[in-house]
């Protein structure tokens, strides 16, 4: 009888814990995202080389601030809300030199594991010196040789096209 009583108590505790969504894991909000370069450049390349409108939609959905910064501030093609901005953006990159640059950047930076490893190592060293610094989001882009690094409030954009050339 005593065992049955213990089983009922344990079952009730498990039921109440799951009903209250009791977590045995650490708070998910406090876990930092892994530090790596987000591949915005791949979406950009897909749109600019194939004209795939779904890639542009995904750029606007997944990277709205980055897309606005690229189109409005870096390339200065107009505002993101212009009716014809997608066509203007696509036509800007139809130059054969820029198309070759996109293809070269895509080939050169197909794998960024070494860059991500160095980034983690460097940022960990920076956090040792400045423990209160918040981890920004790093993303790669193609910027038509305009800027090498773009700094936002909580993001750092790396223009891969500026890092092409002889090693």
Language-model features: locations:
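Bacterial N-terminal signal peptides that target proteins for export
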Residues: 1-8
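C-terminal motif of bacterial Sec signal peptides marking the signal peptidase cleavage site
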Residues: 16-19
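N-terminal mature-domain "stem" immediately C-terminal to a signal peptide or N-terminal signal-anchor/transmembrane
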Residues: 21-91
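Acidic/His-rich structured neighborhood in mature extracellular/periplasmic domains
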Residues: 90-167
């Amino acid at each position: 009888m005593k065992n049955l009583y213990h089983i009922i108590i344990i079952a009730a505790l498990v039921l109440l814990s799951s009903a209250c969504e009791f977590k045995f894991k650490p708070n998910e909000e406090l876990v930092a995202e892994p530090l790596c370069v987000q591949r915005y450049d791949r979406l950009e390349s897909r749109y600019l080389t194939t004209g795939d409108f779904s890639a542009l939609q995904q750029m606007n959905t997944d990277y709205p601030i980055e897309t606005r910064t690229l189109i409005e501030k870096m390339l200065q093609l107009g505002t993101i809300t212009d009716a014809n901005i997608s066509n203007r953006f696509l036509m800007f990159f139809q130059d054969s030199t820029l198309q070759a640059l996109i293809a070269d950047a895509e080939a050169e930076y197909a794998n960024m594991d070494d860059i991500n490893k160095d980034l983690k190592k460097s940022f960990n060293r920076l956090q040792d010196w400045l423990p209160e610094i918040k981890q920004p989001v790093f993303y790669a882009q193609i910027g038509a040789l305009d800027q090498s690094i773009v700094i936002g409030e909580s993001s750092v954009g790396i223009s891969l096209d500026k890092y092409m050339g002889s090693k």
